[in-house]
């Protein structure tokens, strides 16, 4: 029964509001429900109809007479088939907005490209394993049991034959073969490397030395190999020193003077002794010899402490002393006649 409208009439193209029952029947605002779904009002009405139909079916079943177990089984099978059909209908539905017309639902997503190294042979992807397990669950259990990672040594497949006596015999045989083996490697003498037998080089005092320029070159510390020399090395070095001395002596050999040079040398020496005075070098040598003889005859006395004398720094070290003596020996070669003719 429509309500009486009081007021001006609606313009053409507009509809009047219906009753409350009509409003309930109108669809609710929002996205439309997908197919195979019904609104809550329709569900409630359907549930009422289903309950009434079930009640009527129950009354009919109570009125029917059970003729035997076969009739009960038939009714049970029919009920199971109806339940399966209902479950299939429920599974067809899905949640979410419906696809627009013209679009088809894809059953499976396209395979994604594999990023990374390929799996080794014999391995299956997790998706393939799950599909295989769905098809054959019994086979999946056997495969999983076989593919389990085994940690540790595998157990022996057969009986283990271990005997202490056989182990000792094998070990003795190996030692015998090692001792009696006449290979070329065993015949060669074992020579150790140089870093095992020689002293290392002098370590630099990194960060601990003086932070000034060097006033002179580094003094050689001498031969340090004497600490690690073997008898064979000492013999070899002795031979080398002898050969070096022979070669140096050959170089220092004077040339044989001729008869004329010898005669002229004797005349010059006799003239110098008779006509010339004694040289300063000879005078100095004579004084040193006489002084050394006097000091030898004097009794040794204890000398008192002298600060200036005893605490004086000796700047003339041993290396400089040796270098000066070596140079002084060469004076005779620098200021003497040549190795050829003594006289023109």
UniProtKB/Swiss-Prot annotation:
Modified residues (N-acetylalanine): 2
Keyword Oxidoreductase recorded: no
Region (Disordered): 1-309
Ranges of Basic and acidic residues composition bias in the record: 128-137, 167-191, 231-265, 273-283, 291-309
Pro residues bias: start-end ranges: 111-120
Motif annotated as GPALPP motif 1, chain positions: 7-12
Protein name according to UniProt: GPALPP motifs-containing protein 1
Organism of provenance: Pongo abelii
